[in-house]
Structures are given as C-alpha cells and as structure tokens.
C-alpha cells in the first residue's frame, strides 16, 4: 500500500514562477508524496492577504479554467445539504471474492468432516463477506477559500471494528482516484506579490481492503 500512496500526488503546492514580466508568469505544480490517505488537513497561513478577492471567485471564470476536470460527483461549489455522503455499511454490491466462494466448509482444520447444507453455507459466506468487506465511506470536506471548488467528497476506510475473524486486521486504502482542483497561489511580497489560480491534484480513496 505504501507504494500506492507514495505514487499519488498529494496536492499541493508550490512553485515556480518563471519567464518574463508579471503578465507572463507561468506556474508549475511540484507534487509532494503522500505517506497516507486520506490527505491530512492543510495548515494555512491565516493572513487574509493570501485569500482570493471577490472578483477572483467568479464561478463562470473558474469553471472555464477547470474545464472538463470539474466532477460534480466529487466536488461542490456550495456547501452540500448532506455532509455525510455514504449510507450505513450494507451487504457489498461487488461480486464475492473467488477465495471466499471456494472456501471449503465441510472439513475442519483438524481434518474432521462436517455436513453443511447449501442454504447454511450461502448464509455463512454472506456473513463472512459482510464482516470482512471494507467499504469506502464518503463525507464532504471543506478545503477552505483557497481551493475551488472548496468542497470535496473525501473517502475513508471503515474503521469502527476489525475486519478479520479472529480480530487483528483492519481496513486500509488500496486504490485512489485523483481529482483536479484549483488552488489560489501567491508568491512574492508587497507590491511584487502575484496571485493566481493553479491546478492541483487531490487523491481520494476509492477502494479499501482488509489488511494487516
């Protein structure tokens, strides 16, 4: 899992201006590796001088700048009415893993044969699949004024109990999707300060797995 998360770009931040006059600034994002998901909360400079102004927040302009990267399934311009975007965990909708289907319930670890009816076997496998399944739970998160759209639907692995029987293993992220947002970026000081919107990538957990 470490290689997956390290390969994902964390979102932020910085760099580099370059060539020519202030009207010709070019910004390039330098991604930082993420050691884990979900992305931890970003500690921002509280100085309002680093905030976008009202004229910098035109929805029409920013939608055009973000283009096809805008994904209403994972981002929202306005505060969503329902912050919890996931229903309570239920029976998985994905196909049951092959290793569960092939599980032999007619023999104990000590070699003793037991009789298990088809209905009982099906019920037990469904229970085991439900118990060991690791759903992704989504909630809306406010990234703040310096991101646009400022609301992101962030995924978390179910963590209220162990996912193994006996206990000991837990749900951990194994896959993520990357969404592109706009980040308000400023450089320079005083009269030399220049601010603009740049595109940054934000990884979101898309699949979890029961793991050590």
From Swiss-Prot:
Subcellular location: Secreted
Source organism, top-level taxon: Eukaryota
Annotated spans, Disordered: 37-56
GO cellular component: extracellular space
InterPro entries: Cystine-knot_cytokine, Noggin
UniProt main location, coarse: secreted
Any matching Pfam family: Noggin
Signal peptide: 1-23
Gene3D superfamilies: Cystine-knot cytokines, Helix hairpin bin
Positions with biased composition (Basic and acidic residues): 47-56
KW Signal (keyword) present: yes
Residues annotated as glycosylated: 84
Keywords: Chondrogenesis, Developmental protein, Differentiation, Disulfide bond, Glycoprotein, Secreted, Signal
GO biological process, one term: negative regulation of cell differentiation
UniProt function note: Inhibitor of bone morphogenetic proteins (BMP) signaling.
Annotated PANTHER family: BONE MORPHOGENETIC PROTEIN INHIBITOR, NOGGIN, NOGGIN
Family: Belongs to the noggin family.
Summary of subunit composition and partner proteins: Homodimer; disulfide-linked.
This protein's name: Noggin-2
Native source organism of the sequence: Danio rerio (Zebrafish)
């Amino acid at each position: 899992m470490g290689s997956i998360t390290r390969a994902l770009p964390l979102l932020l931040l910085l760099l580099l201006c370059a060539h020519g006059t202030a009207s010709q600034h070019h910004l390039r994002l330098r991604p930082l590796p993420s050691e884990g998901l979900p992305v931890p909360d970003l500690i921002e400079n509280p100085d309002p001088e680093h905030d976008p102004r009202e004229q910098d927040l035109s929805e029409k302009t920013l939608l055009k700048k973000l283009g096809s990267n805008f994904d209403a399934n994972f981002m929202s311009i306005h505060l969503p009415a329902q912050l919890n975007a996931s229903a309570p965990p239920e029976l998985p909708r994905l196909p049951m893993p092959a290793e569960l289907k092939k599980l032999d319930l007619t023999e104990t670890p000590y070699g003793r044969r037991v009789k298990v009816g088809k209905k009982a076997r099906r019920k037990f496998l469904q229970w085991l699949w439900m118990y060991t399944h690791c759903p992704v739970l989504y909630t809306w998160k406010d990234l703040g004024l310096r991101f646009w759209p400022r609301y992101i639907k962030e995924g978390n692995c179910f963590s209220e109990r162990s996912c193994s029987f006996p206990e000991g293993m837990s749900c951990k992220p194994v896959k993520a999707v990357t969404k592109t947002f706009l980040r308000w970026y400023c450089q320079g000081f005083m009269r030399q300060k220049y601010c603009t919107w740049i595109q940054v990538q934000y990884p979101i957990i898309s699949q979890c797995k029961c793991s050590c």
